[in-house]
Amino acid sequence: MIFSSLFSVVGMAVLFLIAWVFSSNKRAINYRTIVSAFVIQVALGALALYVPLGREMLQGLASGIQSVISYGYEGVRFLFGNLAPNAKGDQGIGGFVFAINVLAIIIFFASLISLLYYLKIMPLFINLIGGALQKCLGTSRAESMSAAANIFVAHTEAPLVIKPYLKSMSDSEIFAVMCVGMASVAGPVLAGYASMGIPLPYLIAASFMSAPGGLLFAKIIYPQNETISSHADVSIEKHVNAIEAIANGASTGLNLALHVGAMLLAFVGMLALINGLLGVVGGFLGMEHLSLGLILGTLLKPLAFMLGIPWSQAGIAGEIIGIKIALNEFVGYMQLLPYLGDNPPLILSEKTKAIITFALCGFANLSSVAMLIGGLGSLVPKKKDLIVRLALKAVLVGTLSNFMSATIAGLFIGLNAH
């Protein structure tokens, strides 16, 4: 146990070192912000995964969200009949169908979040969380609000919360907005992961830990050395009534679901094509099982080991994490699913499952770069060159944040097991 815990600490130190190496201005790093963000990220991990009361609260929250998702299945079942799961979560007659089980729930959840915005419930949470981050970290109001918003909405939608302030924000603040978007996932997408069978408590914990984690590494890699914007409140689209809010949310969710479905169709097919070509090449080289997963697993095995995964399981973990970074997190979670079932190809420890789940829980992948540039660039055109230049660094920050959350999760789950 002691060795495992120490290795988790070493993994954290390596992540900090990587960020420091890529820092654009090491002298400008505000260590008060860095230490405070790290303490908050660790504290959230401890509360959710180690402290008994916190674990009970997380389980209760997860059960509540799962119940809300089950109500969404009523709408899905109305459209698709017995093909859809029932309110208890029992699969339809066709078994698990991604478009029915997952994409339809994204639409329902997006509509629910839109309603919560209209009722002023979501802005209240964003203001509270964003205000707390601002006071604890010393970050600007605008970037703190954006970080809080990213817990609930996608990285293309969160900047809309602070849209009136984007033009006056410094380069470091814009970069922070990019980074927290890459480190987080949207509420509707999180519901989609849960509908796939990914453990919801881990997803919720990872989502909340992404806010301080994204700011932590953003302020190491691109420190603040300009005047920051001091005032920003949540700016939301005004709806006429609750019906319009629900309808607009459904439209937004439909666009998101179509995007996710199209991306998966393309990327899963492309993955199969790449593996087929590698299989042909491998046949000539006497390596019949050559695949992209095998290559990524071999290359990233040391990284997975550094995150706290046993060496015997690190190859599988490296493969899944690599596919997530190269393609997207949905494909990564689809690769993880067989190891969460009753007859896994390889038995993974609960700690390993948790570390992989946390490491995948973010939009930090190469396929998100175009969405980031197009979405944020359209809101603040004069900063588009900056956004393009820093997009890959934002993916790096998001990845480091997810890895830090994964390492923290592995530490506390390991301690809890003993």
Swiss-Prot record:
Disruption phenotype: Mutant is deficient for transport of inosine, guanosine or adenosine. It is found in: Cell inner membrane. GO terms for biological process: nucleoside transmembrane transport. InterPro entries: C_nuclsd_transpt, C_nuclsd_transpt_met_bac, CNT_C_dom, CNT_N_dom, Gate_dom. It is a multi-pass membrane protein. The chain crosses the membrane at residues 2-22, 34-54, 93-113, 174-194, 198-218, 264-284, 292-314, 354-374, 395-415. Its main location: membrane. Involved in purine nucleosides uptake. Could also be involved in uptake of nucleobases. Belongs to the concentrative nucleoside transporter (CNT) (TC 2.A.41) family. NCBIfam families: nupC. This is Nucleoside permease NupC. The lineage of its organism: Bacteria, Pseudomonadati, Campylobacterota, Epsilonproteobacteria, Campylobacterales. The gene is nupC.
